[in-house]
Amino acid sequence: MSGWLSGPRDSRPLGHSAIDGGGDPFSGARVVSVAHFEPAAGMQGEALDSYKRRFGTLFVDESTRRRGGIGSVVRATNVLGEQFALKTLAIPERDERASEAECERYEAGLKTAFRQEFECHKAVSGLKGFPHLYGMGEVAGMPAIVMEWVCGETLVHVCDALAVDGAGRMPTLVAAQIGRDVFDLLAHLDFLEGGFVHRDISLANVMVCTSRLSLAEQVEEGFFDVCLIDFGSSTPEEMQGSSFTR
């Protein structure tokens, strides 16, 4: 499964959704506006204007919202019916014991970290096994990142689904095959100029994508379409010390 991902796996219209098999993607959705949109890839002129319009208005499905790190992710659909993941910075309620200046510094730090997550994600967008990144803007005044919506399950759920005993152990061969494919994914990071460190590789941050083949079909084939998600802790390798987790 080595190679490069030339584009997003699945931004098809939701009328035939890989998530729910169909239905009205706009039913019960909340409308949000994405302001000050900045594309992940450089463009200008009419192409830039057209690209911004593609993400200007999104319909979010709150039932899909998941919290992780300093943000929350929700599935969003644009007016063309394309689906994306919308990650918005989540700033906690202010501590009444903290001063106004302390709260402002804390919020500024979160925004800086969120921006760094976007920049790190840009470095791997386009690599096989990483979600495609579209851009960054603001939703209701909060920084927001628009990226590929990955259809699949995290390794947490995969382990449960494939467990052969009450302890949650997977078949040894399947575990080795998944480990091989995760290693293959990480090996591509060596091609990046300056390097890249994820720093939070866990069962919750590795997904098995099922938009092409079901989990059962991938088990049968012995190869897994794995994807690394959540770049909130990532950083360029040159910023690391002598100890880190890729």
Where are these regions (language model features)?
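Juxta-kinase regulatory segment immediately upstream of eukaryotic protein kinase catalytic domains
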Residues: 3-56
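Protein kinase glycine-rich loop
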Residues: 62-68, 73
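AlphaC helix of the eukaryotic protein kinase fold
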Residues: 102-123
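Activation-segment/catalytic-loop signature of the eukaryotic protein kinase fold
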Residues: 136
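Conserved short submotifs of the Hanks-type protein kinase catalytic core
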Residues: 140-154
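Activation segment signature within eukaryotic-like protein kinase domains
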Residues: 178-179
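Catalytic-loop of the protein kinase fold
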Residues: 190-210
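Activation segment/activation loop of eukaryotic-type protein kinase catalytic domains
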Residues: 204-246
